[in-house]
């Protein structure tokens, strides 16, 4: 990724529902949709921020609010997303654009006791292309669609799902 990513580069999952209603409805009830709003996560995140003030904020949001992580959005001082007027790209947790703007497989460092893991994303939101596992996708007027073979591999989920 050579350009800086802005939080405004990410589309809300609600926009995707216009054409992909079934996928949106499946996502809406998933852990991904609630990755940043689940009370168990929020309690653990707040504990982590207290015990590790220098790494606690970013350590958790890299996977639970990846749009905030890659855009550098400052979540310092945020204890609960409902108490702040945060962009939907953050409150939606792991939404469509996080995965469907991935342009390359994204490995991640495994967590060790003395090192905070850093998720590595190779994404390009805002460019207007959505990637997926369908070869020769239909054209549409909303965004360009492209096939990437990495979407057929579970290893495309490695930025976050890296624990053995």
Give names to the regions the model predicted.
Residues 1-92, 97-152, 158-162:
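Sequence context of c-type cytochrome heme-c attachment sites
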């Amino acid at each position: 990724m050579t350009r800086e990513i802005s939080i405004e580069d990410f589309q809300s999952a609600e926009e995707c529902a216009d054409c992909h209603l079934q996928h949106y409805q499946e996502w809406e009830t998933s852990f991904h949709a609630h990755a940043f709003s689940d009370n168990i996560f929020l309690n653990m995140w707040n504990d982590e921020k207290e015990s590790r003030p220098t790494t606690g904020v970013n350590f958790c949001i890299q996977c639970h609010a990846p749009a905030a992580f890659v855009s550098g959005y400052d979540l310092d001082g945020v204890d609960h997303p409902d108490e702040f007027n945060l962009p939907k790209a953050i409150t939606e947790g792991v939404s469509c654009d996080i995965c469907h703007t991935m342009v390359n497989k994204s490995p991640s460092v495994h967590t060790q006791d003395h090192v905070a893991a850093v998720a590595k994303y190779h994404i390009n939101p805002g460019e207007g292309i959505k990637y997926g596992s369908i070869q020769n996708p239909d054209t549409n007027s909303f965004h360009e669609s492209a096939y990437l073979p990495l979407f057929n591999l579970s290893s495309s989920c490695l930025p976050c799902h890296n624990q053995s």
